[in-house]
Amino acid sequence: MTATEGIRPDVARTVRYPVYERFYTWQGEGVHLGAAAYFIRLYGCPQACPWCDSAGTWHHDSRPEGVTLMTAGALAAVVAQDSPDGAFVVITGGEPILFDLAPLVDALHALGRRVHIETSGIAELRGAIDWVTLSPKPFGTWPTPEVVARADEVKIIVHDVADLQAGLDTLEGLRPDAVIWLHPEWSKARERDMAVLNAITDAVKTNPRLRAGYQMHKLYRADELDAHSDKRLIPLGGNTDLGY
């Protein structure tokens, strides 16, 4: 099938998404850890996480000079060109559900690709997305009940011990089969902050539904191997000098 088969041609050609970066790598966290994946990172996010590792998608001191606008059809075409059949697609950000993803999801499905999303869940989730990874930001806008109910897995970023319970508090209505990951924020993992690491260990031992997680792609620096990735431009874990 072609990249635009299955969706209206006018939609495939006219809806445009602000693409910060796109690259082929593997999923570095969660249930699909280690699996080949093509990432589409969209520009724009209102959450302003203080430890953001993709601050180029929103922070005024790190955003690019220009952002490429691409149609659903054009994005599907580069996915088909730059990754083999069988690799799923991850739409991330920034905050991707600020945009109507239905045309893009349809175009990717027309290629036979499964579509995953990584989101903080603050808006309506549009499109027949196959896998929803929810990463709530309790200090910002909480996820909507509708997105919580659709989540297949949850990733709570633990920058300090209080973040752990605060993240869990946002999950009322979560499906019983949804997986809940506790990830140390990257600087805490890198510096072996034992208060954070031990809090995650204690939480998992207390509640077997929880799982301890890690961002393995950062150890491998796998994203940087694709020429289209901008990871080399933004320090891993953000830039504390700029306040993120």
Where are these regions (language model features)?
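Short, solvent-exposed beta-strand edge segments and adjacent coil->beta transition regions
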Residues: 35-37, 151
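Conserved Radical SAM active-site core
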Residues: 3-6, 12-13, 17-24, 36, ...
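Conserved AdoMet/S-adenosylmethionine-binding subsite of the radical SAM
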Residues: 85-86, 97-244
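A short beta-strand-turn-helix
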Residues: 28-30
